[in-house]
């Protein structure tokens, strides 16, 4: 009888553990496209927290601070692995957690619109599931939330319809350091909890590629003053960058930051805008952009103290090499390598400015080039591309690209034939020997 009681207790405890589920938390009122949401939660950790597991998903991108220190810069992947589901980052042994009181802060950027590389959901928010030993902390109604007051969408020309990202404006006079441990969030609202089945997020699917590689803040190759208000900063190559500026100014001065690729492909892409506060200050653009030069348009009475850039990108090593006596071919190799690398991030891309879209006419070239020039991490992006292509099939089983996408569903037959043929799936298989993926897409 005692053994039966023990068994019943164990089963009940397992049922209880199974029913604990991290839901999606959001702002309790309507969230407009291009909004930035702040979330905070204080947790108490009993023992050593160095070994932990964090599962975190967002629509659309997130930044994570633990005890005031930035731990994840631009987490999350554009939606999604198929038309219904959402990617989830799974992070092992996240740094910064300590025994006792800990403050978790999250900033979420909600695209709120469709694009050639992203399918929008109706729910701006975050799902958090943190396990430390036997303790578990989830996104529930105990979290606090606020709309970040500094972010706004500039009034200028909007990015073309292929991009789900909006231009990003930031007003430093309204800045709140909400990630600080001692920040007072008592005036914030309680989050709204939404069950996954009602969110439009579908199932959470593990992120199949590495987190971004952060190369740190670096000096430009050179900076030239082109006029009283225009500074041109030269990058070492076409790169995915977050431009940075340190300056001294009066409050309310408007600074425009964009690259020479702003109209790459002819249509408007993305740019950043910054409104100064009074005094010495720093600003780093939150959204990445690409180009060979960064153009800073700055009022005359603003004193520029420093200009830098942060390159981030797909986490792979430039492992291949080529050299010969002809400098033309050496230069061609270097340019080709940089062209390949800059078209890799959430997906392979046709271009990193106008579309950021996974057209398979480009992917078949890129996946083949990766075998000669990059390490094995690159092939995870190819595998992701293959699975997405097949998991986004229409109801009649035909395939189309680019995917993921929210405002495109047309088939380009020649690209689709290339994807499933010699230069696509077959090249991937011959280079990796990954039978499981091939079996999955050729059932």
Predicted regions and their residues:
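Bacterial Sec-dependent N-terminal signal peptides
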Residues: 1-23
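Extracellular/oxidizing-compartment recognition motifs
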Residues: 23-353, 362, 377-383, 399-407, ...
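Short, hydrophobic/aromatic alpha-helical segments in well-folded domains
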Residues: 244, 290, 369, 385, ...
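Carboxylate/His-rich catalytic cores and anion/metal-binding grooves
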Residues: 254-256, 363-391, 441-443
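Alpha-helix N-cap/helix-initiation motif
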Residues: 325, 355, 410-414, 430, ...
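Aromatic-lined, polymer-binding surfaces characteristic
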Residues: 329, 356-363, 391-403, 409-425
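Structured segments of extracytoplasmic/periplasmic soluble domains
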Residues: 339-342, 388, 392, 428
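Well-ordered alpha-helical scaffold segments within catalytic/enzyme domains
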Residues: 365-376, 420-437
């Amino acid at each position: 009888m005692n053994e039966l009681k023990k068994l019943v207790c164990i089963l009940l405890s397992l049922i209880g553990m199974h029913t604990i589920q991290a839901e999606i938390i959001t702002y309790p009122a309507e969230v407009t496209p291009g909004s930035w949401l702040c979330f905070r939660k204080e947790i108490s950790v009993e023992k050593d927290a160095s070994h932990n597991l964090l599962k975190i998903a967002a629509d659309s991108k997130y930044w994570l601070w633990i005890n005031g220190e930035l731990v994840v810069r631009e987490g999350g992947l554009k939606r999604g692995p198929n038309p219904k589901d959402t990617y989830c980052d799974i992070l092992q042994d996240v740094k910064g957690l300590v025994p006792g009181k800990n403050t978790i802060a999250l900033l979420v950027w909600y695209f709120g619109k469709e694009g050639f590389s992203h399918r929008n959901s109706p729910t701006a928010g975050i799902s958090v599931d943190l396990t430390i030993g036997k303790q578990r902390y989830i996104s529930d109604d105990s979290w606090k939330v606020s709309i970040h007051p500094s972010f706004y969408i500039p009034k200028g020309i909007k990015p073309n319809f292929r991009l789900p990202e909006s231009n990003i404006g930031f007003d430093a006079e309204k800045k709140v350091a909400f990630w600080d441990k001692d920040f007072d969030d008592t005036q914030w609202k309680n989050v709204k909890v939404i069950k996954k089945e009602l969110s439009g997020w579908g199932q959470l699917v593990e992120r199949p590629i590495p987190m971004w590689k952060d190369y740190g803040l670096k000096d430009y190759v050179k900076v030239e003053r082109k006029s009283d208000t225009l500074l041109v900063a030269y990058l070492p190559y076409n790169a995915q960058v977050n431009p940075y500026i340190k300056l001294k100014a009066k409050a309310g001065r408007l600074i425009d930051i964009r690259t020479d690729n702003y109209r790459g492909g002819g249509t408007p892409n993305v740019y950043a805008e910054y409104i100064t506060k009074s005094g010495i200050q720093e600003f780093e653009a939150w959204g990445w952009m690409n180009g060979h030069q960064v153009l800073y348009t700055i009022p005359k009475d603003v004193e520029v103290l420093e200009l830098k850039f942060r390159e981030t990108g797909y986490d792979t090593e430039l492992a291949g090499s080529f050299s010969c006596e002809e400098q033309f071919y050496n230069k061609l190799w270097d340019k080709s390598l940089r062209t390949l690398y800059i078209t890799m991030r959430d997906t392979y891309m046709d271009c990193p400015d106008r579309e950021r879209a996974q057209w398979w006419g480009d992917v078949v070239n890129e996946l083949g080039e990766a075998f000669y020039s990059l390490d094995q991490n690159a092939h995870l992006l190819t595998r992701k591309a293959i699975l997405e292509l097949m998991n986004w099939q229409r109801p009649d089983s035909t395939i189309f690209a680019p995917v993921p996408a929210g405002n495109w569903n047309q088939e380009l037959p020649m690209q689709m034939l290339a994807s499933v043929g010699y230069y696509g799936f077959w090249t991937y298989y011959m280079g990796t020997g990954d039978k499981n993926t091939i079996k999955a897409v050729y059932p």
